[in-house]
Curated annotation (Swiss-Prot):
GO MF entry, a single one: phosphoglycerate kinase activity
InterPro entries assigned to the protein according to its UniProt record, in alphabetical order: Phosphoglycerate_kinase, Phosphoglycerate_kinase_CS, Phosphoglycerate_kinase_N, Phosphoglycerate_kinase_sf
Assembly and interaction partners: Monomer.
Protein name in UniProt: Phosphoglycerate kinase
């Protein structure tokens, strides 16, 4: 089944029509100042919003931010996001103090053609994330009443069966925004027949979080490079000592089985940066990955591993990267992530960064985002797509 697109909606004339755009404005906030720490997700929705503004639509944007547990919490207000969105659009964004209440209704009613409103955090209402279909549906009814058409441009949320993602499209003419369409095209290529050699780089802390995607990708890839905290469970499965490094004991046997079935495709670190403690200023040095001293904790892949991973990436035609190679938030343990990211960025391959912490690392390390073919805005969503799962938000757009 095909998905109707933003261009299909624009062709129908949207001047003066109220268009509800589900965006993913779930940006990280600085814990001290409350300011936006990374506006990448706001920038990602600009092509869709700009097209609607230029077409004269009355644009109503909605999003979640954080996990406020179904009631208003000023810590998770979208007000700062409205300010930044207005700066990026070059025009004021009208902010509604609630999501479907009096403020939302009056703010939307007052919009002129080509103006933009942002509703308060969707998750301030328990109906957004409710598992009760009636409660979720009632909230979806209220949201849908604010608009004449619906655009989903929140790829980072399409794996959630939430009211604004799954239920609202059933109540309004619905299309995919520019971002969602691009994500589906790119991930469809990776899930289908990508150009070979196809090399996947996986990091992050837990094997259990990536097990399903490893199972799905192993038959398709030529090499699978494993770094980050998850590598220590694989090293343990090979019989090596991992000191006090992160270890999922219950996953050791699973990793052993994966290594046996992988037939040499899985490449693990040969050296790691081990520290005396999990702290930015902890004493640390590089040790062999097959014998991490007891009471020491591996916090990054070592330089020999970076060189080996870079060599494995050199001849690739397609590269997918998800998850940092170490604790990149601490400068002493960011070298592995930087080295691998730079190897991917300088590759001639079709390169996809799989959202979440990987996308954050690209920006935090000051790397050129344009050097990558695509940086996904959906961490969990991109992995679930590659696992072959049905994503509720995509299914809703297809219906």
């Amino acid at each position: 089944m095909t998905i109707r697109t933003l261009d299909d909606l624009l062709a129908e004339e949207v001047t003066g029509r109220r268009v509800l755009v589900r965006a993913d404005l779930n940006v990280p906030l600085d814990k001290q100042t409350g300011q936006i720490a990374d506006d990448g997700r706001i920038r990602a929705v600009l092509p869709t919003l700009s097209a609607l503004v230029q077409a004269g639509a009355k644009v109503v944007v909605c999003s979640h931010l954080g996990r406020p547990k179904g009631s208003p919490n000023p810590v998770f207000s979208l007000r700062p996001v409205a300010g930044r969105l207005g700066e990026l659009l070059g025009a004021p964004v009208h902010f509604a103090e609630d999501t479907v209440g009096d403020s939302a209704r009056s703010t939307v009613a007052d919009l002129a053609d080509g103006q933009v409103a942002l509703l308060e955090n969707l998750r301030f209402n328990p109906g957004e994330t409710s598992k009760d279909e009636a409660e979720r549906g009632a909230f979806a009814d209220q949201l849908a009443a604010l608009a004449d058409a619906y655009v989903d441009d929140a790829f980072g949320a399409v794996h959630r069966r939430h009211a604004s993602v799954y239920d609202v499209p059933a109540r309004l003419p619905h299309v995919a925004g520019r971002l969602v369409l691009r994500e589906v095209e790119v991930l469809g290529t990776l899930a289908g027949e990508p150009d070979r050699p196809y090399v996947v780089v996986l990091g992050g802390s837990k094997v259990s979080d990536k097990l399903a995607v490893i199972e799905a990708l192993l038959p398709k890839v030529d090499r699978l490079l494993v770094g980050g905290g998850m590598c220590f469970t694989f090293l343990k499965a090979q019989g090596h000592e991992v000191g006090s490094s992160l270890l999922e004991e219950e996953m050791v046997e699973t990793c052993r089985s994966l290594l046996e079935r992988a037939d040499g495709k899985i490449m693990l670190p040969v050296d790691v940066v081990a520290a005396d403690a999990f702290a930015p200023d902890a004493p640390h040095d590089t040790v062999r990955a097959d014998g991490i001293p007891s009471k020491r904790v591996g916090l990054d892949i070592g330089p020999e591993t970076v060189a080996g991973f870079a060599a494995a990436l050199r001849g690739a035609r397609t590269i997918f990267w998800n998850g940092p190679m170490g604790v990149f938030e601490m400068a002493a343990f960011a070298h592995g992530t930087r080295g691998v990211a730079e190897a991917i960025a300088t590759s001639d391959a079709f390169t996809v960064v799989g959202g979440g912490d990987s996308a954050a690392a690209v920006r935090a390390l000051g790397l050129d985002e344009q050097a990558f073919s695509h940086i996904s805005t959906g961490g969990g969503a991109s992995l679930e797509y590659l696992e072959g799962k049905t994503l509720p938000g995509i299914a809703a757009l297809e219906s």
